[in-house]
Amino acid sequence: MGNYKSNLETKIGVVKNPILVSCRESIMENKKSFYGRFYIGPLEVGQGITLANALRRALLSELNGLAITTVEIEGVSHEYSTLMGVRESVLDILLNLKQIVLKSKKSVKRAQTAYIYCQGPGVIRAGDIILPSSIQCVDPEQYIATLSSDGILKMKVIIRQGKNYLVQTPNSLFFDEVSEFVLDKNNLAEKRSEKQSFQHKIFLQNSVNKKKWGKVEEKKEPKLSFFSHSGSRPSFLFKTKVGLKSKALTFSFQNSRSLYTISQNSKNKELFINLFKKQIYSILALKVSITKSQDPNNFSNLLCSFFLTSKNKTKPLFIDAVFMPVTKVNYTLEENKQKLFDEIYPIVSNDNLEKNWVKVKKSGFFLSNQQLSFEKNSLFEESKLQQNTNNEAKHKNNGNGKFVDSKLLKQSTTSNFDYNYWSLFSAELNNNSSSWTTLNSNIFFEHFNQSPKDIIILEIWTNGSILPRTALKHATQNLSNLFIKFQNAKMMKNSFFETNKTYTQTIRQLYEKYQNF
């Protein structure tokens, strides 16, 4: 028995009265709904509701999840527009994208980009999204849109990781576009409205500041500049002199280094390649602008050939994302031991007493011969007591002439209840091959059997991106980390109660100020 006790202490970390968690039921209702039911206990009366509330709040608000936050659809500037060849409106497409559930095996710290490029006829589903390698779709059959024979849908999706939910308000002055081109003329800022010319005015102001330092020559010719909205990120900007009647183009970089020198000296080769691609796109943008001034009718066809769209036609659309992987949490508290005992193990009657006693005897709790005989006789006495309505203090024991104290009888029924009570939480108690079956529960859990305990029955529903038991594990870790930080917190030094002398001085000063009033 000593060896078994030491093994148990090493398993539970020398905790005399541990809290056990048992997954009693786990069901996959559909691809986007997992259900789990857990028994947590035993807890002292009053502790159950404290722990249950904390677990529920942690499950609903402390777990990370993935969601689509921003969408860019080619040729769409707002969510109330429609697309040619697409059955759904843009608003319906955004709502369908919001319902897509994503999961990842590792933490996603940066925003990820996914793409959709489909041509009709056909049905677009979540499985058609080109996702990063680290992100998966829970339900690939999630419906997005239906295309006709002439329908084409090009879409860019931004995926982020977060907690709770995200409410976004669209701002016309901030867009996450990669780049755009603006034709800067002298009187263009004055003719446009204040909102439309906000970015244009900023560019003019920056150019004026550069003129003061002599970096840019003062010329009245219109300049075509290529820049990004981020502003803070460095980019290879170049300026081009465009004559309205001239077809010649002359390019000049801000620095005099060649492309080969820049590529050799650049620390990040991939960044240089991306920037060089932007330069190529800018050349196409310049050609498009000149072609527009010469032949406006052929401008739309040229845009389609270069896969470019006008600035005002494509804008990012924001989605109010929901990151919570746990959709619903319910809990109930059971404070009566006898109620749980009656639900799982029916009350012993005279007819099946011997049958039930054999089941208890084969349970694996190895008691001594005297204890076994005493338990059996006590169960017979309990069945007789249930038939009699009188409340006598002493009862005869099977006609042997001996008297059994009612306290001893209560202890015997309690010891029988120990096995049934702890089998609620641990499946190992029902397994004869387990080392737990050779232990008597009274040795380690005697303090818990003296009074009723709280048992938490916790029900968890997830959206399919995480298992209920994994969600419970992460919520428990978050709570434990929070309380560990609180336990290791240091009290700030406060001289108010440091010594009696400072305390009396402070009280005297407060009293003097009070008298002055």
From Swiss-Prot:
Subcellular location: Plastid, Chloroplast
Chemical reaction(s) catalysed: RNA(n) + a ribonucleoside 5'-triphosphate = RNA(n+1) + diphosphate
InterPro entries: DNA-dir_RNA_pol_insert (IPR011262), DNA-dir_RNA_pol_RpoA/D/Rpb3 (IPR011263), RBP11-like (IPR036603), RNApol_insert_sf (IPR036643)
GO biological process: DNA-templated transcription
Gene3D superfamilies in the cross-refs: DNA-directed RNA polymerase, insert domain (2.170.120.12), RNA polymerase, RBP11-like subunit (3.30.1360.10)
Domain remark in the UniProt entry: The N-terminal domain is essential for RNAP assembly and basal transcription, whereas the C-terminal domain is involved in interaction with transcriptional regulators and with upstream promoter elements.
Protein name: DNA-directed RNA polymerase subunit alpha
